[in-house]
Regions:
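A generic structural signal for short coil/turn motifs at secondary-structure boundaries
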Residues: 47-50, 95-96
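Acidic, aromatic-enriched beta-alpha/helix-loop junctions
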Residues: 50-74
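Extended, well-folded catalytic/binding cores that form a central cleft or groove in large enzyme
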Residues: 35, 48, 55, 59, ...
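Short glycine-rich, low-complexity/disordered patches
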Residues: 68-84, 121
Length: 121
């Protein structure tokens, strides 16, 4: 008997979670001179539980996959860390462990031709 939840359960749509839709882009702003700002909006406090952390990392990974796609290049041009940002708008009362985890994602994002920016709501 399996005791853990499957990835399908972990990442399924959950409107009650601070990251309700892991595989959807919350906001995309294509820039006039190329590139884009892709925003993740976390409007309620995000805890440091394993599920929340995994949902956040999967959402960033989903954005990075989009940035590396042909569809992104068609819409926004060639992505670079100078013209393409993932902006995490996070509730100011989110667990500090989440902010530490985000600080460790900068190199991962840069390696995938974008810049990670964290802003408080």
């Amino acid at each position: 008997m399996e005791t853990g939840s499957s990835d399908d359960d972990l990442y399924k749509d959950d409107p009650s979670h601070p990251i309700p839709y892991v595989f959807n882009c919350d906001i995309e702003a294509v820039l006039k001179d190329g590139g884009a700002d892709l925003s993740i909006v976390i409007a309620s406090p995000l805890g440091s539980d394993t599920r929340s952390l995994k949902r956040l990392l999967k959402k960033i990974e989903t954005y990075l996959q989009f940035i590396c796609s042909e569809g992104f290049r068609t819409e926004s041009g060639i992505p670079t860390a100078e013209n393409t940002r993932i902006v995490v708008h996070i509730h100011k009362k989110s667990d500090p462990a989440i902010l530490r985890a985000l600080s460790q994602c900068h190199e991962w994002v840069v390696d995938n031709n974008a810049k990670l920016v964290v802003e408080y709501l």
